[in-house]
């Protein structure tokens, strides 16, 4: 699962298609952070990944790439392209594991995101902490709708 971090996903997919044997299947997990739904207590916490997407984009990472993968696989020549939704949420996943993921992101990105959004590191950390608190609260829901996409090389 790397397409959101590849500078030129169509070129990557075209190369994957070229390398596959006829009839071979390409399968990947694609991320789309708009599918990350957290019942955070503040508007800033709820908007976190919507606000940071334009900041991350110039680094070559596309946080909303998941929705484009179907089209891109078809455009480079894959056949029988399918989307397999995967929901990871607080009803089927450990809240502690989900919160740990957000803590890793917070600890790795707070300073960068704060600088590029014109916020203080404390304000950016508070956005992540709001999401983490919601994930850990058994009365709140959080989930991530991920997409696994597959396509077959023509025979």
Annotate each predicted stretch with a short phrase:
Residues 68-72, 126, 146:
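Amphipathic alpha-helical interaction segments
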Residues 82-142:
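C-terminal helical/coil "lid" or tail adjacent to the Rossmann-like core of SAM-dependent
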Residues 7, 21, 78:
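Short conserved AdoMet
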Residues 76-79, 96, 144-155:
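Core SAM-dependent methyltransferase catalytic element
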């Amino acid at each position: 699962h790397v397409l959101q971090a590849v500078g030129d996903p169509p070129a990557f997919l075209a190369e994957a298609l070229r390398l596959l044997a006829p009839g071979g299947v390409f399968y990947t997990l694609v991320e789309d952070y708009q599918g990350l739904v957290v019942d955070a207590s503040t508007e800033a916490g709820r908007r976190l990944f919507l606000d940071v997407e334009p900041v991350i984009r110039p680094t070559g990472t596309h946080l909303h790439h998941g929705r484009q993968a179907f089209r891109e696989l078809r455009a480079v020549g894959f056949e029988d392209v399918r989307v397999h939704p995967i929901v990871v949420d607080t009803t089927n996943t450990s809240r502690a594991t989900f919160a740990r993921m957000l803590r890793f992101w917070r600890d790795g990105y707070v300073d960068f995101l704060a600088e590029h959004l014109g916020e203080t590191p404390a304000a950016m950390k508070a956005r992540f902490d709001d999401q983490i608190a919601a994930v850990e609260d058994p009365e709140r829901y959080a989930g991530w709708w991920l997409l696994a996409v597959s396509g077959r090389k023509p025979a």
